[in-house]
Regions:
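Active-site loop/oxyanion-hole signature of alpha/beta-hydrolase fold enzymes
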Residues: 60, 64-67, 73-114
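Flexible "cap/lid" loop of the alpha/beta hydrolase fold
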Residues: 128, 135-167
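Conserved alpha/beta-hydrolase catalytic His-Asp/Glu region
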Residues: 148-153, 169-226
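Short beta-strand/loop motif that positions the catalytic acidic residue
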Residues: 228, 234-236, 240
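Short alpha-helix in the alpha/beta-hydrolase fold that links the catalytic acid
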Residues: 221, 230, 244-252
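Acidic catalytic loop of the alpha/beta-hydrolase fold
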Residues: 238-243, 268
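Conserved HGGG/HGGXW glycine-rich cap/lid loop of the alpha/beta-hydrolase fold
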Residues: 29-82
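Catalytic active-site module of serine/aspartate enzymes centered on a nucleophile-bearing elbow/loop
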Residues: 258-298
Length: 298
């Protein structure tokens, strides 16, 4: 592997977009990074994918449209795809710190964090932990928390036991996150897309998936999300089976000045119907960019 791993800045400056390589984040590990260069001087969007997905599966169909106006960067989160190897427990805070470390490695002073589902929670944590680096937020199909009802709390209680069973049973460790991921995807009409999605999901282990779902179930930003002071857009998937619309809207209402961009689609529209998702995502990013520019000193 040593011959394939390069410094992040070297990797992303070598070729025209879209470019993907394994790259090293100093002191943290090796991950896969994608970049579309965008126009000279364009604002940077840092794309953060959802649980069990990879950057390619979550964002692959929007790289090119976004890059017409923005510099676009995406990372495989730790434990997912070619992401940094994770330990016995997956932490959203570690993922947020990885994204900030990538920005540091690339000399990116500030960026717009664009997070999808679990990635939206990581984007929220970027504000909490690395606010000086954020120029905006785009939060898609996500919430302040997903663990509220008694049934959801009961389900979450089983996750530590399941994670421990996999950790101590060698026969279970090679199992992939395909089941979890296909549940999130829902119906996929195109057979080629379904095959591609399954192949991507198999690159994440079941143990990581369970640990990540547990981290998502424990996340809450209720006490501090109202402190967000950067331009924010919330993309609401109004037919979502995974994150209730009511929770997505509560997130939007909790953030001062957040714009809402509705899309009549299920949770994984980013993958199952990118032609529907892309215009709404672009609208959300343009909204944040317009407000960011207005806030700049004259």
């Amino acid at each position: 592997m040593a011959g394939r791993v390069k410094n992040v800045r070297q990797v992303l400056g070598e070729a025209a977009a879209p470019l993907t390589r394994l790259a090293e984040l100093p002191g943290r590990g090796v991950t896969r990074v994608w970049e579309c260069a965008g126009p000279p001087g364009a604002e940077t969007l840092m794309l953060i994918h959802g649980v069990t997905f990879t950057a390619e599966l979550n964002w692959g169909k929007v790289f090119a449209p976004l890059s017409r106006d923005f510099r676009v960067i995406a990372i495989d989160l730790r434990g997912h795809g070619d992401g940094i190897k994770t330990g016995s427990r997956f932490r959203l805070e570690d993922c947020a710190d990885d994204v900030a470390a990538l920005a540091e490695a690339l000399d990116i002073t500030r960026f717009v964090a664009v997070g999808y589902s679990m990635g939206g929670m990581i984007a929220q944590l970027l504000f909490k932990r690395h606010a000086s680096r954020l120029s905006g937020l785009v939060l898609c199909a996500t919430a302040r928390n997903v663990l509220g009802s008694p049934i959801e709390r009961m389900a979450a209680l089983a996750l530590p036991t399941a994670a421990a069973a996999i950790q101590w049973n060698p026969l279970l460790q090679p199992m992939s996150a395909e089941f979890f991921g296909m549940t999130l995807l829902g119906s996929v009409d195109d057979p080629a897309t379904a095959r591609w999605a399954r192949a991507q999901l198999r690159r994440t282990t079941l143990a990581t998936a369970i640990s990540a779902v547990r981290a998502v179930s424990e996340f809450t930003s209720h006490s501090w999300i109202g402190e967000v002071d950067v331009p924010t857009a919330v993309v609401v998937t109004t037919r979502d089976r995974i994150v209730p619309v009511s929770r997505q809207m509560k997130l939007a209402r909790a953030i001062p000045g957040a714009s809402v961009h509705e899309i009549a689609a299920d949770h994984a529209v980013c993958t199952t119907a990118p032609q529907v998702f892309t215009p709404v995502l672009l609208e959300a990013c343009w909204s944040v960019e317009a407000r960011r520019i207005r806030q700049q000193p004259a």
